[in-house]
């Protein structure tokens, strides 16, 4: 599926692209000549591994003597895998991940201008290049992006007598009560370890909260966040969400939505390609701004993943890394990855990958220009992100929202 859109908002041309990823193969150790490298890719869906295997075959055919060993890892295991790589000094040459600044702080990775050519660097859209810097220097290589909006099932809404998607939290609760009477799950709320930080971040930013204050200091336990988590706990306890949000992952509720079992949820641009179309291309659903507490200002979560290149063997791997990364970022290769998966493009050249389906992607592009991102430029984010994934859901189960957030705040302050 190849769809892409180029949208212009706030003076920025945002190129959109779809991506496809797959399963894992074995990783290998570097050859002494530096011509064999290891690439660890995150699994986005079942298309991930086939894409990378084909691209690597093509790369090796065009670059005799160079070899890329591939390992594809599920997102649920990625954090622990990366932690082990670093602790055992077995990090790959190239890693597809959602963090980078802690590696930059510890001088483990190449700067962006050391990892790719000037042509590739210039191709990154400024919005994403700016999110890939540590202390004013770009280290992360923008890989894919996504924006989050509110998905709702029109058929379920019709049965519940609801004519429009909710704009405020009060409306979310009111609509959820009506949907519950139809027998459907009112609201999908994934606070399990896959991406709890994203789900909670969506709700908190739409209540004036966030991870840091205006000065950039950690503010995980700020009043707005406590209020947000208390609200989500209320919805859970009133049976207005799926059972056990604290153990439910994003992909679980996305699948249930695709099956027509959930009335509404915070969704992602890749939902249609990765979840809805494979199950029911005729599903009647709509996309709307994310609800906010007051129903007037609607913030969007922007998500960006990166490629990072680790320094190894005194820099002996750099030439092979350069060749492989420059090969991937060629327009035809990057566009094909994006069109396989359904993500938004981070480069100018891949901006037409979604043009055949502009109507679907336009709201996401428009939202992305003003989106709020996780503080990935703060090396402490890796620790905070991990703590949120493991702990935030306990607050809607049997924990206390304020105490849970205080605990995560302590982790943040310790991380720096």
Regions found by a protein language model. Give the residues of each.
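Extracytoplasmic/periplasmic solute-binding protein
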Residues: 139-143, 148, 170-219, 233, ...
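Hinge/lid segment of periplasmic solute-binding proteins
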Residues: 98-149, 167, 173, 179, ...
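Glycine-centered hinge/linker elements that transmit conformational signals in sensory
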Residues: 176, 217-246
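Conserved N-terminal structural module of periplasmic/extracytoplasmic solute-binding proteins
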Residues: 3-102, 164, 292-295, 316-320, ...
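Long, aromatic- and glycine/proline-rich binding clefts that accommodate carbohydrate-like moieties
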Residues: 131, 288-289, 338-387
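Extracytoplasmic "Venus flytrap"/periplasmic binding protein-like
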Residues: 58-126, 133, 158-160, 164-167, ...
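Extracytoplasmic/periplasmic substrate-recognition and gating elements
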Residues: 57, 61, 160, 230, ...
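Conserved C-terminal helix/tail region of periplasmic/extracytoplasmic solute-binding proteins
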Residues: 158-159, 366-416
């Amino acid at each position: 599926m190849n769809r892409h859109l180029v949208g212009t908002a706030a003076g920025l041309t945002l190129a959109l692209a779809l991506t496809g990823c797959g399963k894992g193969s074995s990783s290998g150790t570097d050859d002494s000549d530096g011509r064999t490298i290891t690439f660890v890719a995150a699994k986005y869906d079942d298309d991930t591994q086939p894409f990378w295997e084909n691209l690597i075959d093509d790369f090796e055919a065009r670059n005799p003597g160079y070899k890329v060993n591939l390992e594809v890892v599920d997102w649920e295991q990625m954090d622990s895998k990366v932690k082990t790589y670093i602790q055992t000094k077995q990090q790959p040459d190239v890693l597809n991940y959602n963090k980078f600044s802690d590696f930059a702080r510890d001088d483990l990775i190449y700067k962006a201008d050391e990892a790719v050519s000037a042509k590739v660097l210039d191709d990154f859209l400024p919005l994403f290049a700016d999110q890939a810097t540590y202390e004013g220097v770009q280290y992360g290589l923008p890989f894919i992006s996504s924006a989050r909006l509110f998905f709702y099932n029109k058929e379920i809404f019709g049965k519940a007598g609801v004519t429009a998607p909710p704009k405020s939290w009060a409306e979310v609760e009111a609509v959820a009560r009506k949907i519950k009477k139809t027998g459907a799950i009112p609201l999908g709320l994934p606070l399990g370890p896959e991406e709890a930080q994203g789900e909670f971040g969506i709700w908190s930013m739409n209540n004036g909260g966030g991870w840091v204050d205006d000065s950039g200091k950690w503010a995980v336990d700020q009043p707005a966040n406590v209020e947000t988590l208390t609200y989500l706990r209320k919805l859970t306890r009133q049976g207005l969400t799926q059972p056990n949000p604290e153990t439910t992952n994003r992909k679980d509720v996305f699948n249930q939505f695709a099956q027509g079992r959930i009335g509404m949820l915070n969704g992602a641009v890749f939902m249609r390609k990765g979840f809805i179309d494979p199950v029911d291309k005729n599903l009647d659903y709509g996309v709307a701004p994310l609800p906010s507490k007051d129903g007037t200002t609607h913030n969007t979560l922007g998500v960006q993943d990166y490629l990072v290149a680790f320094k190894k063997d005194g820099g002996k791997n750099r030439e092979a890394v350069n060749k492989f990364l420059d090969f991937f970022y060629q327009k035809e290769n990057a566009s094909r990855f994006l069109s396989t998966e359904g993500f938004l493009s981070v480069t100018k050249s891949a901006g037409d990958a979604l043009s055949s389906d502009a109507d679907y992607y336009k709201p996401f592009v428009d939202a992305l220009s003003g989106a709020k991102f996780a503080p990935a430029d703060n090396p402490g984010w890796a620790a905070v992100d991990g703590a949120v994934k493991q702990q935030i859901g306990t607050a809607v189960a049997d924990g206390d929202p304020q105490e849970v957030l205080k605990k995560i705040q302590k982790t943040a302050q310790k991380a720096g």
